[in-house]
Each structure stands twice: as C-alpha cells, then as structure tokens.
Amino acid sequence: VIADEVQSGFGRLGQGMWGFANYGLEPDIVTMGKPIGDGHPMGAVIVRPKLVSSFGSNTGYFNTFGGNPVAAAVGIAVLDVIEGEGLIENARTVGAYTGELLDALK
C-alpha cells in the first residue's frame, strides 16, 4: 500500500496526523511534500525497512539535496507549530463548520 499524503498529511484532515490512519491502513510507503515545509521546498518518502534495506547497498543511489540541515530545521519547526498551536483540532473545527455551511446550500 502506498499512501500519498502530499495533500492530506500533517493534520490537514483534522483527524490525526495522517489521512491513511482514518481508514486503518498501514502503508508500506508514505509520500509527503508541501505541508512538511509549510512553503519551504521539501518532501519525503517513508518506506518500511524491509522494502528499502537492500536499496542503498545494491544501487549506489545518493541525493545531493538529502539531509539538508535548513530543511530539517524547517520540518521540525513545522511540527512544533502544528502541536503548539493545536492545528489538527483547528482543522477539525474549521472543517466541521465548512461542512455545515455547504450542507445549508443543499
């Protein structure tokens, strides 16, 4: 299972950190992008160890942008803000309110 959390991750759905968790899924691969850096260009792919264990030793792959300390600091700051400002709960509240407004248009 591959979960694409580029749009739905980092609490944007208002129910936990990841959209896939709302469906009881345990993905093998998770992709994430825009929300991890909140405007700073960064992304990540999280892979189960059993799937990636031989990748590095068999391919010789490397990335000149991987492990950038500025991007890592941005990612940590974003996580701190999500937690410190209660943004997951805020997404839940705003989402419920928006849903009510949309239902009223029926």
Language-model features: locations:
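Conserved N-terminal phosphate-binding loop of PLP-dependent enzymes in the Aspartate aminotransferase
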Residues: 1-106
